[in-house]
């Protein structure tokens, strides 16, 4: 199945419960393949429900799962490439070349033709997010598990990735903070989630100083 993209897509979409009412010939093909796999591997009748809300069409789970299927087919030694013996430029190159199947060139959702047709590839910004939130953390965990001392190399990799953009980072920027790389933004995201969101101002050097200054202004 790792060498059959149609079956991989059928497996992903079928386990999401999206193939039960096919509306075109491609969906019918995926549905047949999923029923075959379901019988062959005695798959449990469990359905996962990826979310579409608040996502841009290019980020829809339909597109991302197709790209994931393509990645599995094209890279049979994925763990070694991404985690065990990573070559960062090579990873970027293969991710940049990755695309969804032809069906999604003129679709975002099943059975609905899009107004604009284009090959669905990964954007540079999305590839950066994969490094920040997936590839580098897994590399760190793997090296810690195997007592390897390459943590500094991973930290340097974060320094070489541009800062990500999200609403939390935007709030920090509105306060005058300037970010040069993703190592800095990750530190401030940790700060927000660990202290600010949990209202642990007194346990935070920054929060404590702000409260201290506020108290001095009152007096």
List PLM regions with ranges.
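Hydrophobic, aromatic-lined core segments that form the binding pocket/scaffold
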Residues: 1-185
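Acidic, carboxylate-rich catalytic segments that either coordinate divalent cations
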Residues: 174-219
């Amino acid at each position: 199945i790792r060498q059959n993209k149609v079956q991989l897509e059928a497996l992903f979409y079928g386990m999401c419960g999206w193939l039960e009412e096919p509306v075109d010939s491609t969906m019918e093909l995926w549905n047949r393949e999923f029923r075959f796999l379901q019988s062959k591997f005695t798959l449990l009748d469990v359905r996962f429900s990826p979310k579409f809300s608040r996502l841009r069409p290019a980020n829809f789970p339909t597109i991302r799962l197709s790209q994931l299927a393509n990645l599995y087919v094209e890279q049979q030694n994925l763990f070694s490439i991404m985690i065990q013996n990573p070559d960062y430029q090579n990873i970027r190159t293969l991710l940049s070349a990755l695309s969804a199947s032809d069906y999604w060139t003129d679709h975002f959702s099943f059975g609905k033709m899009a107004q604009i047709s284009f090959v669905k590839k990964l954007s540079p910004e999305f590839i950066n997010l994969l490094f920040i939130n997936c590839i580098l953390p897994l590399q760190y965990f793997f090296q810690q598990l195997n007592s390897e001392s390459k943590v500094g190399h991973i930290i340097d990799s974060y320094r070489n990735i541009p800062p990500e953009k999200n609403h939390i980072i935007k709030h920090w920027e509105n306060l005058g903070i300037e970010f040069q790389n993703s190592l800095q933004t990750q530190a401030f995201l940790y700060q927000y989630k660990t202290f600010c969101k949990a209202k642990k101002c007194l346990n935070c050097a920054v929060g404590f100083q702000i409260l201290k200054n506020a108290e001095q202004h009152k007096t």
